């Protein structure tokens, strides 16, 4: 859950300020507006906390009636989160009879990061191993625990509290992201984590807190408050855009590979600029050569009940009958009954080809050329 209070160098934004130290102070000049996604995430965390406390036999008040974003999906996600931690607890009990479980534990990692603090969703400590678990309700971005700087900051804060009490030698960090069917775990030795903190985290955090260091653009710009106006981002993307003055057939393979590695960032930047300019225009700013107009809209009913009544009174059926989609059908039947009745009628067609970095975990597709070469080799 997001920490209470304001931290210039928050763990959640550490991926950005570790790559681009000056962005920390730059973002400080912008208002924190929040978002519906953040509000939904906060509600989900509250429900997760309740579910876990209840599963552990602790007293806790059901927050459901006060959650603006509560729905059946959030209920399932929170239940799954609590079950996951209870299963992890059962596993640790096999090796340690008295593991420690902490929920919504405030952690302080200010030994390495000025004013560094946060709140860890769950911490589980057993013989030799400390588990740090973070719930992510987001759907848009798949979050990995591997070398995740936010998780490492939380782990450092947890070690500050418990390293002198328990004999910890291994830290296990887990991201639980149910809406992406993602459970990502990364283990590191305590010594390696401390080495990273001393050699990478602290020196960079000192630069960031002082507003020093060099600007650097990358995928971490996505959540930067200054991304719409950042001059370093403009210069980096305009430099890449200069390739557009060559027709693709004239580009070398290496040039195309450079563009491919940055194209998503370029598209994202262009979209950010358009959205920023639009919001400024709505607020009254006038851009030379541009004007604000009413966009296209589609007709809609002012009252669906009135439409339904009028059509039925005229002797017609206003509703279409449509087969439920797979997700809705599974909710209707239940998972086991769904598999029993419909497994034979479900298929997953091959996905549309998409070009991704080599680091992507999905296996490479066979192209027509590869298929031909395989047949040729087998002859």
Task: Outline where the language-model segments fall.
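Short coil/turn segments at secondary-structure boundaries
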Residues: 27-29, 60-65, 99-104, 215-222, ...
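Extended, charge-rich alpha-helical segments
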Residues: 268-379
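Hydrophobic/aromatic-lined pockets within catalytic cores
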Residues: 52-56, 137-140, 155-163, 206-209, ...
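DEDD superfamily 3′-5′ metal-dependent exonuclease/proofreading module
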Residues: 2, 46, 52, 56-63, ...
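Alpha-helix N-cap/helix-initiation motif
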Residues: 33, 37, 142-144, 252
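Metal-dependent nuclease catalytic cores that hydrolyze phosphodiester bonds in DNA/RNA
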Residues: 1-130, 170-172, 263
